Amino acid sequence: MKQQANLIRAGQVIEHDGRRWTVLKQQIITPGKGGAFIQVEMRDLKTGNKTNERWRTADTVERLLTEEKEYTYSYMDGDNIVLMDPETFEQTLLPLDLLGDQAPFLQDNMVLVVNLVEGDPVGVTLPAQVTLEIIEADPVVKGQTASSSYKPAKLSNGVKTMVPPFIEAGERIVVRTEDASYVERAKG
């Protein structure tokens, strides 16, 4: 399906130069002189290579339609993750690199959304937030109360994040899977 280049968004799958690409980032740039253009960072679905491409905003690109299907995460198998189809109970093997930076947030029995193009997996979406335990938290530095200060902490999955000063080691917090940022204390 053809669409204007200025409508490209992260997560979409497009066809360019006879290859399939998943869009990682996009930015519309309007220079002081000349027409606006869109800068797109994308990854080749076959090779995994990244590239940057520029189009004028009026150009058209071929967008591929993706189908979303829910799977349940089972376990890791080397550089792959094993997912189970909750309807048929069939197991599917996907490369871990489809998750990118979100891989450490995988939890047993987590429901993932797999994006498929013509039956081939092209991306995996995790839930927006997960609950994890703080295993290490720096002590509060006295006198840093004038502004909203955060301190470094290490989560149970090994990821480091910044948390408010009242959070201590052993507490459970909710973090965003997108950027590992603190959301709130876990309830219950």
Swiss-Prot record:
Q: Which organism is it from?
A: Gluconacetobacter diazotrophicus (strain ATCC 49037 / DSM 5601 / CCUG 37298 / CIP 103539 / LMG 7603 / PAl5)
What GO molecular functions are on record for this protein? translation elongation factor activity
Family stated for the protein in its record: Belongs to the elongation factor P family.
Q: Pathway it belongs to?
A: Protein biosynthesis; polypeptide chain elongation
Q: Cite the SMART domains for this sequence.
A: EFP, Elong-fact-P_C
Which protein are we looking at? Elongation factor P
The record's subcellular locations are: Cytoplasm
Which CDD domains does the protein's record reference?
A: S1_EF-P_repeat_1, S1_EF-P_repeat_2
Q: Name one Pfam family in it.
A: EFP_N
Could you tell me what this protein does?
Involved in peptide bond synthesis. Stimulates efficient translation and peptide-bond synthesis on native or reconstituted 70S ribosomes in vitro. Probably functions indirectly by altering the affinity of the ribosome for aminoacyl-tRNA, thus increasing their reactivity as acceptors for peptidyl transferase.
Entry keywords, A to Z: Cytoplasm, Elongation factor, Protein biosynthesis
Annotated Gene Ontology cellular components are: cytoplasm
Which GO biological process entries does UniProt record here? peptide biosynthetic process
Q: Give me the disulphide-bonded residues.
A: none
